[in-house]
Amino acid sequence: MFKKGLLALALVFSLPVFAAEHWIDVRVPEQYQQEHVQGAINIPLKEVKERIATAVPDKNDTVKVYCNAGRQSGQAKEILSEMGYTHVENAGGLKDIAMPKVKG
């Protein structure tokens, strides 16, 4: 019985801990309202530095940024990396993302 308990405890602590995943739409609010990835938060590129800590307080969480074509999301990725976010992905343009979308 004791060995089974130790084995179960060892398994729990050996499982990887996954950080949360956040989708950030860096387009202007009007574009976000027309269509966006389901669950995404709208933080326009020019506001990323000021607002990201509220939306994503843990810098080890996965942050996926997107825009219309990938240029602004590339800039956002650079900004977030410079701010210490460790898992930032440029997801490119909205049309290229294979995730459920919400249309306004």
Curated annotation (Swiss-Prot):
Gene3D superfamilies: Rhodanese-like domain (3.40.250.10). The record marks G93 as: May be important for providing the necessary conformational flexibility for enzymatic catalysis. The active site is at C67 (cysteine persulfide intermediate). Residues 1-19 form the signal peptide. Its EC number is 2.8.1.1. The keyword Secreted does not apply. It catalyses: thiosulfate + hydrogen cyanide = thiocyanate + sulfite + 2 H(+). GO terms for cellular component: outer membrane-bounded periplasmic space; periplasmic space. Its main location: periplasm. Residues 20-104 form the Rhodanese domain. Catalysis proceeds by a classical ping-pong bi-bi reaction mechanism, whereby a covalent enzyme-sulfur intermediate is formed on the active site cysteine. The phage shock protein (psp) operon (pspABCDE) may play a significant role in the competition for survival under nutrient- or energy-limited conditions. PspE catalyzes the sulfur-transfer reaction from thiosulfate to cyanide, to form sulfite and thiocyanate. Also able to use dithiol (dithiothreitol) as an alternate sulfur acceptor. Also possesses a very low mercaptopyruvate sulfurtransferase activity. Monomer. This is Thiosulfate sulfurtransferase PspE. The gene is pspE.
